[in-house]
């Protein structure tokens, strides 16, 4: 995978001992399953073979489940897909999910990585899903972001 413009190389992390949770929606199953596969591969590569995985129906349900998971996990990865339709519903869902995840992260002081794809077309989502034909793997990227942030917070808290 070549990655999108500006995407950094994903660092190799030892996240042993980090309690990781992944919440993934079920709409656009092929894409969400691929995002989840990418997240699980990164977790395993970072020393976490058994992250907590919770499936929800749609993207709008992700923030409340992420909030509950943040109570007893060091990092949460949110995965889903919202594809623009012909009504304003897309904008409302994307805004609600993004604001919800940000609020949960700040309120809980737990990294919540936003791997919810918000695209204009299904093709754009497929190109970011981590499939063999995809340019990017947003599930993997979100997982690295969550784990790296959890490790940074652990280090900062150890020195405060």
From Swiss-Prot:
Gene Ontology molecular function: any one: 6,7-dimethyl-8-ribityllumazine synthase activity
Residues at which 5-amino-6-(D-ribitylamino)uracil binds: 27, 59-61, 81-83, 114
Family as reported in the entry's similarity comment: Belongs to the DMRL synthase family.
Positions in coiled-coil regions: none
Subunit-level organization: Homopentamer.
Gene name per UniProt: ribH
Origin species: Mycobacterium tuberculosis (strain ATCC 25618 / H37Rv)
Function: Catalyzes the formation of 6,7-dimethyl-8-ribityllumazine by condensation of 5-amino-6-(D-ribitylamino)uracil with 3,4-dihydroxy-2-butanone 4-phosphate. This is the penultimate step in the biosynthesis of riboflavin.
Keyword tags: Riboflavin biosynthesis, Transferase
Gene3D superfamilies per UniProt: Lumazine/riboflavin synthase
Catalytic activity: (2S)-2-hydroxy-3-oxobutyl phosphate + 5-amino-6-(D-ribitylamino)uracil = 6,7-dimethyl-8-(1-D-ribityl)lumazine + phosphate + 2 H2O + H(+)
EC class (word): transferase
UniProt activity-regulation remark: Activity is competitively inhibited by substituted ribitylpurinetrione compounds such as 3-(1,3,7,9-tetrahydro-9-D-ribityl-2,6,8-trioxopurin-7-yl)propane 1-phosphate, with inhibition constants in the 4-5 nM range.
Residues noted as binding (2S)-2-hydroxy-3-oxobutyl phosphate in the record, renumbered to the chain: 86-87, 128
Entry-linked PANTHER family: 6,7-DIMETHYL-8-RIBITYLLUMAZINE SYNTHASE, 6,7-DIMETHYL-8-RIBITYLLUMAZINE SYNTHASE DMRL SYNTHASE LUMAZINE SYNTHASE
Protein name: 6,7-dimethyl-8-ribityllumazine synthase
Region forming the signal peptide: none
């Amino acid at each position: 995978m070549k990655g999108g413009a500006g995407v950094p190389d994903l660092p190799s992390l030892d996240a042993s001992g980090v309690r990781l949770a992944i919440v993934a929606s079920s709409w656009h199953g092929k894409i969400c399953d691929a995002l989840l596969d990418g997240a699980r591969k990164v977790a395993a590569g970072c020393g976490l073979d058994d992250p907590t995985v919770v499936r929800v129906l749609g993207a709008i349900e992700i923030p409340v489940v992420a909030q509950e998971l943040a109570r007893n996990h060091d990092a949460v990865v949110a995965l889903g897909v919202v594809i623009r339709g012909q009504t304003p519903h897309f904008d409302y869902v994307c805004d609600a999910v993004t604001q919800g995840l940000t609020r949960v992260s700040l309120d809980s002081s737990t990294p919540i990585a936003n791997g919810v794809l918000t695209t204009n077309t299904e093709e754009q989502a497929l190109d970011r899903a981590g499939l063999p034909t995809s340019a990017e793997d947003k599930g993997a990227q979100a997982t690295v972001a969550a784990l790296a942030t959890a490790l940074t917070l652990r280090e900062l808290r150890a020195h405060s």
